Amino acid sequence: MKKTGSFAEFHVNMIERVMVRPCLPSPKTILPLSAIDNMARAFSNVLLVYAANMDRVSADPAKVIREALSKVLVYYYPFAGRLRNKENGELEVECTGQGVLFLEAMADSDLSVLTDLDNYNPSFQQLIFSLPQDTDIEDLHLLIVQVTRFTCGGFVVGANVYGSACDAKGFGQFLQSMAEMARGEVKPSIEPIWNRELVKLEHCMPFRMSHLQIIHAPVIEEKFVQTSLVINFEIINHIRRRIMEERKESLSSFEIVAALVWLAKIKAFQIPHSENVKLLFAMDLRRSFNPPLPHGYYGNAFGIACAMDNVHDLLSGSLLRTIMIIKKSKFSLHKELNSKTVMSSSVVDVNTKFEDVVSISDWRHSIYYEVDFGWGDAMNVSTMLQQQEHEKSLPTYFSFLQSTKNMPDGIKMLMFMPPSKLKKFKIEIEAMIKKYVTKVCPSKL
């Protein structure tokens, strides 16, 4: 390991790269994808960090997880298949049993080099394997798993999954099942249910997550960076009490922090007052379908809520007003579900600029934190937003995560934005907090 600028550079040596197939014969069939599955045409990733366990010194995590993957694919055999295009342009899964790409690697450092994965380090890219951007969709691996061991005995599981196969909740279910296999269970505790025909949304718009170029995007010369900020629950609860003095309203921690993020981003980017801006966030709709989707359904079952308002009106209004706009967007999404659409036209307005859009994902209640391969629960869970060299513009993105043990108890915001805006964003969000409390949350900006 060596220090390069502000980064602790480390090297990962690839030991083996293999295809892992189901350990028992699996059905060879064609499976349909739902309308929502067809919209989610992009990879997403998760990083699970595990500390060394003195009770398992002789165990090889890569071997254990590789064998568990082979076992769990008996139940989740579609992951071992490949996508193919139908004549109408929709996708389906051909269950070929070709397998999941699995990589074993070894880092030349201990886990301390990761620093909770809060601030972007180019070396982190070695922890997740990504296919080339120009890979044909029918050649894509639906799932890629990499296990990287560190010199201290700890390890990182980096998984890259294609969105059409499952959503975050469904993938958490898969990882939990794989962990159960690693701990010696003979079958998953939750029976996986494919049944994509249960999601019948005839009026879904043909919008794909990877096609954000439909939004007008000015060229940004800066490479986006990833860093984090923690807002502790003491501050959130104080803000909640102060706001409720104005109006007796039930306010969630997500709504409060999302409102702070939205307003701070607008100010930091100095968006003109005449512009309309949007806050986008996904919501799990499994229990909102009529009838509700069955327990174990791991396909995409989310909708994109869209909070939208004029910059002048947002900045001249109160924090409560912004929160109520966010609450209204939640209600509107459920209303749209009843009318058989999960994405309104306002979400994909072609006149919206990237700089006017904020996207938030909330992982705080994800099952990712409980995935135990036999070394205990993950000590840290994170994601890595990967900007390709040719991408000159992206929406500002936030992931809400649980704070790690060395941080205050609160919401950890993983942020992805141009570096020139980070300092201003911190100033703005702290200024808003100071209106309600005198103690400002610790940050790592």
UniProtKB/Swiss-Prot annotation:
Recorded hits in InterPro entries, A to Z, give:
CAT-like_dom_sf, Plant_acyltransferase
Q: Which domain of life is it from?
A: Eukaryota
The yes or no answer to whether the keyword DNA-binding is present is no
Q: How does activity depend on pH?
A: Optimum pH is 6.8.
- Protein source organism: Taxus cuspidata
What name has this protein been given in UniProt? Baccatin III:3-amino-3-phenylpropanoyltransferase
Q: Which GO terms describe its molecular function?
A: phenylpropanoyltransferase activity
Q: Which pathway does UniProt place it in?
A: Alkaloid biosynthesis; taxol biosynthesis
Catalyses which reaction(s): (3R)-3-amino-3-phenylpropanoyl-CoA + baccatin III = 3'-N-debenzoyl-2'-deoxytaxol + CoA
Which cysteines does the record link by disulfide bonds?
Answer: none
- Cite the Pfam families for this sequence: Transferase
Family to which the UniProt record says this protein belongs: Belongs to the plant acyltransferase family.
Alphabetically list the UniProt keywords. Acyltransferase, Taxol biosynthesis, Transferase
Annotated signal sequence range: none
Query: Gene behind this chain?
Result: BAPT
Its job = Acyltransferase involved in taxol biosynthesis. Catalyzes the selective 13-O-acylation of baccatin III with (3R)-3-amino-3-phenylpropanoyl-CoA as the acyl donor to form 3'-N-debenzoyl-2'-deoxytaxol.
A single GO BP annotation from the record? paclitaxel biosynthetic process
What EC number(s) are associated with this protein in UniProt? Answer: 2.3.1.320
